[in-house]
């Protein structure tokens, strides 16, 4: 069955007007192809394609960065012309310089942060009581007079008076 599929593929490619033109390679060994717009044997217009043939054939082995950013932009049609090797090397050098500068900045910022933390007093331990939305965190004690009005109304509590002349 494998030989029949290969034969069918050869016949299909022979009848097709698809012309695969290699436009470049990268340092990883990936090959990039351009197929211009053409009409197939049925008269349908097939739009242009940009294809990468990866050096490692399986998709599972793909990792981010295996295809340079410039080639990826060309494949996604965000740039019209394929990148040159000199352009890729120049951009790679710029990326490395930016990474070194950001690392230096991060280290300087870390030192400044440590120095400013030495000048500050240590944080005071705070005691958390209740919930943040609660209006009062202390112990509720009943009062003789009513408190507040509306939804938060609390009636006053009754307290008996001891010396009022009660008969016993």
Swiss-Prot record:
- The yes or no answer to whether the keyword Transit peptide is present is yes
From the UniProt record, list the coiled-coil ranges. none
Q: Does the keyword Zinc apply?
A: no
Please note every region of biased composition (Polar residues). Answer: 144-155
Any one GO CC term of the record: mitochondrion
Where Phosphoserine occurs, residue numbers?
A: 133
Q: Where is this region: Disordered?
A: 108-168
Q: Where are the transmembrane segments?
A: none
PANTHER family attached to this UniProt entry:
ADH DEHYDROGENASE [UBIQUINONE] 1 ALPHA SUBCOMPLEX ASSEMBLY FACTOR 2, NADH DEHYDROGENASE [UBIQUINONE] 1 ALPHA SUBCOMPLEX ASSEMBLY FACTOR 2
Q: What does this protein do?
A: Acts as a molecular chaperone for mitochondrial complex I assembly. Complex I functions in the transfer of electrons from NADH to the respiratory chain. The immediate electron acceptor for the enzyme is believed to be ubiquinone. Is involved in the initial steps of cilia formation, including removal of CP110 from the mother centrioles, docking of membrane vesicles to the mother centrioles, and establishment of the transition zone.
What is the name listed in the Swiss-Prot or TrEMBL entry for this protein? NADH dehydrogenase [ubiquinone] 1 alpha subcomplex assembly factor 2
Provide the species name. Answer: Bos taurus
Per UniProt, what is the name of the gene that codes for the protein in this document? NDUFAF2
């Amino acid at each position: 069955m494998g030989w029949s599929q290969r034969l069918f593929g050869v016949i299909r490619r022979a009848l097709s007007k698809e012309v695969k033109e290699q436009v470049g390679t990268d340092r990883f060994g990936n090959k990039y192809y351009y197929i211009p717009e053409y009409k197939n044997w049925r008269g349908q217009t097939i739009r242009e394609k940009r294809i990468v043939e990866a050096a490692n054939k399986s998709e599972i082995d793909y990792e981010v960065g295996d295809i340079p950013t410039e080639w990826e932009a060309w494949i996604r049609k965000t740039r019209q012309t394929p990148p040159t090797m000199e352009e890729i090397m120049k951009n790679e050098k710029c990326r490395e310089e930016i990474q070194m500068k950001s690392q230096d900045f991060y280290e300087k910022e870390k030192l400044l942060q440590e120095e400013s933390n030495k000048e500050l007093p240590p944080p005071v331990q705070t005691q958390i009581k209740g919930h943040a939305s609660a209006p009062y965190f202390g112990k509720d004690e009943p009062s003789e007079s009513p408190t507040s009005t509306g939804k938060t109304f609390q009636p006053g509590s009754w307290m008996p008076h001891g010396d009022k002349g009660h008969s016993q």
